[in-house]
């Protein structure tokens, strides 16, 4: 997105959606708070991305390979990456990420760096390229393509010989970032175990990140330490509450770092943080990350997927849902059906904004408190609220209470902490005519927010 259009969009929203603004104490001048780059904003606006764990583990029925796998086992005879992308798009996903190389070191593209790749497999007669088919499928379906490249490599003998392996890893990154056109996200895993020589590698993270910046300057870089987007601190798909998009970069300086403040920082961010680094919440639709036939009857329910949406996107994060291809190279039919049902369930919940056309007003009540009031065109029964800060101008809200009234007494619908890009609140079915959002605490003068109300389903 062009920076000028990004800023204009935020300004237009402020002008068009949140007036009138009423008085109150003027906000004091404060230092400029961190804001997202256009790439970070576009990344979060996707809301949903699909992870595809695929490789030799798919054929060995393991989660972590040890690097001794024979490439001959990799032969997904019916591989159809377009089927993956169609299922993702139909379910409302806007991006996909492929494990181009997992910890076993097997590369899904014909790399010059190792023989442990698809070029040594019988698939497509040794001339196949999963990464190429994946990227092309994403583009054909209008999805943004991302790539995961594990730095841990349990096959390559250079692993553990730091300078040599870091050179090789950067060569692999360079191949992926220069052969396949635009890449939207580069996903770095912090795993750092032993290689085939029993040694651990000292990763050159600044060099890895600069390689991405050199060849894909518009890509967002994911890792525990960003620098663009961060892990949410668990693999349950649950962002923290509160969840700030700002962090103190000195707390988590490299992926895989340990320390008492690391997980709290990943989960919650920091209201006083100096950099913008929003959270991505990763989780699998199945118990495992790779496909296992024994898990075919253990695909997440629609309600479980909806809960994940509320605990990730609904807590100012992005949901990265893993849906692993089978040994045939297809998404399993029950997974595809569950994705479609997940889309239908979301559509039912968010079908009609009860607050559309409501009379609204925004009042500053002090330097760091404010109220949003809504009066609906007619009484309605609501169960869900979506609240959004104009994050193009930063994140500020730290605590709020949402009240509702049917025209007489006011009752508390819900209480919350941070808002950010989006906060989704569920509350008992309540008939309302008026709504009042009271911002009780903020890290900076809060800007006018947007609220939508839904009956749910």
Please provide the spans of the model-predicted regions.
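Mature catalytic domains of secreted/periplasmic carbohydrate-active enzymes
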Residues: 8, 24-403, 412-417, 421-423, ...
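Inter-blade boundary loops/turns of WD-repeat beta-propellers
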Residues: 405-407, 456
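Short, conserved beta-strand segments of beta-strand-rich sandwich/propeller modules, principally
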Residues: 434-436
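N-terminal export signals
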Residues: 5-24
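Surface-exposed, short loops/turns at beta-strand junctions within beta-sandwich domains
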Residues: 429-431
């Amino acid at each position: 997105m062009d920076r000028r259009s990004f800023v204009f969009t935020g300004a237009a929203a402020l002008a068009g959606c949140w007036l009138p603004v009423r008085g109150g104490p003027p906000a004091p001048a404060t230092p400029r708070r961190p804001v997202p780059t256009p790439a970070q904003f576009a990344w979060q606006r996707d809301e949903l991305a699909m992870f595809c764990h695929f490789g030799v583990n798919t054929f060995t029925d393991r989660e972590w390979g040890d690097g001794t796998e024979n490439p001959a086992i990799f032969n997904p005879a019916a591989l159809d990456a377009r089927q993956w992308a169609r299922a993702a798009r139909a379910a409302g996903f806007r991006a996909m990420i492929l494990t181009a190389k997992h910890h076993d070191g097997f590369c899904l593209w014909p790399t010059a760096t190792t023989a442990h790749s698809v070029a040594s497999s019988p698939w497509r007669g040794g001339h196949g390229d999963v990464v190429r088919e994946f990227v092309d499928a994403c583009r054909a379906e209008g999805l943004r393509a991302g790539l995961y490249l594990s730095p841990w490599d349990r096959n390559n003998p250079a692993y553990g010989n730091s300078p040599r392996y870091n050179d090789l890893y950067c060569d692999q990154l360079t191949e992926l970032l220069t052969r396949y056109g635009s890449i939207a996200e580069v996903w770095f895993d912090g795993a750092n175990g032993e290689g085939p020589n029993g040694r651990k590698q000292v990763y050159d993270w600044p060099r890895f990140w600069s390689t991405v910046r050199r060849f894909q300057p518009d890509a967002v870089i994911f890792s525990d330490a960003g620098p663009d987007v961060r892990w949410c601190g668990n693999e349950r798909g649950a962002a923290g509450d509160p969840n700030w998009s700002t962090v103190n970069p000195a707390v988590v300086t490299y992926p895989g770092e340990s320390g008492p403040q690391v997980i709290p920082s990943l989960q919650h961010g920091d209201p006083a943080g100096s950099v913008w680094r929003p959270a991505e919440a990763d989780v699998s639709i199945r118990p495992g990350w790779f496909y296992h036939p024994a898990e075919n009857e253990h695909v997440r329910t629609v309600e479980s997927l909806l809960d994940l949406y509320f605990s990730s996107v609904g807590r100012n994060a992005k949901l990265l849902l893993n849906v692993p291809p089978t040994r045939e190279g297809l998404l399993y039919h029950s997974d595809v059906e569950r994705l479609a049902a997940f889309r239908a369930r979301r559509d039912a919940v968010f079908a009609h904004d009860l607050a559309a056309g409501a009379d609204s007003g925004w009042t500053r009540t002090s330097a760091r408190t404010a109220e949003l009031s809504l009066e609906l065109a007619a009484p309605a029964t609501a169960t869900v609220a979506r609240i959004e800060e104009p994050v193009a101008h930063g994140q500020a809200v730290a605590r709020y209470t949402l009240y509702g009234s049917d025209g007489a007494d006011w009752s508390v619908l819900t209480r919350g902490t941070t808002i950010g890009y989006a906060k989704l609140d569920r509350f008992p079915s309540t008939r309302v005519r008026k709504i009042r959002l009271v911002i009780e605490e903020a890290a900076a003068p809060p800007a006018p927010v947007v609220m939508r109300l839904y009956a749910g389903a």
